[in-house]
């Protein structure tokens, strides 16, 4: 779910970034330059952080016509990692992500709207735990340019907040833990 959101963020940021023509990008997961992280309140006293280690995605954008941009991301929900094996096992269970039944989460953008210089709202359909809901990712363009290996890259960050019960995740964690914030950091390689 985080990965999908991240891909959407990258797309929206790129749209307002600085390219003069339409371009297709692949999210750089091989070089470990893309992350789908999350945080959720732990009992209202602190934050629990985690990440999804296996995801893939692509985006296309045209700075001259951001509304035509698209983003698509697929995330392996079993790749969740909170740095605690027993907790990760519980998150993968039917109490939360139910990975045996819903092994992937996806994000498909439906619209991109510029919100200012270098920022955009990326709206799309997030499918998580077998439930599809619209989400909006607040995206920010970080930068773009040539890399040392002859390629061209663009980077973005984004955030969105999800209500767990919207995705049929109903395990009672207390009132301080009803939402999860997705924190996306994406770098794409122009194809």
Swiss-Prot record:
<dbReference type="InterPro" id="IPR007372">
    <property type="entry name" value="Lipid/polyisoprenoid-bd_YceI"/>
</dbReference>
<dbReference type="Pfam" id="PF04264">
    <property type="entry name" value="YceI"/>
</dbReference>
<keyword id="KW-0732">Signal</keyword>
<protein>
    <recommendedName>
        <fullName>UPF0312 protein Pmen_0419</fullName>
    </recommendedName>
</protein>
<keyword id="KW-0574">Periplasm</keyword>
<dbReference type="InterPro" id="IPR036761">
    <property type="entry name" value="TTHA0802/YceI-like_sf"/>
</dbReference>
<dbReference type="InterPro" id="IPR023480">
    <property type="entry name" value="UPF0312/YceI"/>
</dbReference>
<feature type="signal peptide">
    <location>
        <begin position="1"/>
        <end position="22"/>
    </location>
</feature>
<comment type="similarity">
    <text>Belongs to the UPF0312 family. Type 1 subfamily.</text>
</comment>
<dbReference type="GO" id="GO:0042597">
    <property type="term" value="C:periplasmic space"/>
</dbReference>
């Amino acid at each position: 779910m985080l990965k999908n959101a991240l891909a959407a963020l990258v797309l929206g940021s790129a749209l307002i970034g600085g390219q003069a023509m339409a371009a297709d990008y692949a999210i750089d997961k091989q070089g470990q330059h893309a992350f789908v992280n999350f945080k959720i309140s732990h009992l209202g006293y602190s934050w629990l952080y985690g990440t999804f280690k296996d995801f893939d995605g692509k985006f296309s954008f045209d700075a001259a016509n951001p509304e035509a941009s698209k983003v698509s991301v697929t995330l392996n929900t079993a790749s969740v990692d909170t740095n605690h094996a027993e907790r990760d096992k519980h998150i993968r269970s039917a109490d939360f992500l139910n990975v045996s039944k819903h092994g992937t989460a996806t994000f498909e953008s439906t619209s991109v709207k510029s919100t200012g210089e270098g920022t955009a709202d990326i709206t799309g359909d997030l499918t998580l735990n077998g439930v599809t809901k619209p989400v909006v990712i607040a995206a920010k363009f970080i930068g773009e340019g040539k890399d040392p290996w002859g390629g061209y890259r663009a980077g973005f960050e984004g955030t969105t907040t999800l209500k767990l019960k919207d995705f049929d995740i109903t395990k009672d964690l207390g009132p301080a833990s009803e939402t999860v914030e997705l924190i996306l950091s994406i770098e794409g390689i122009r194809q």
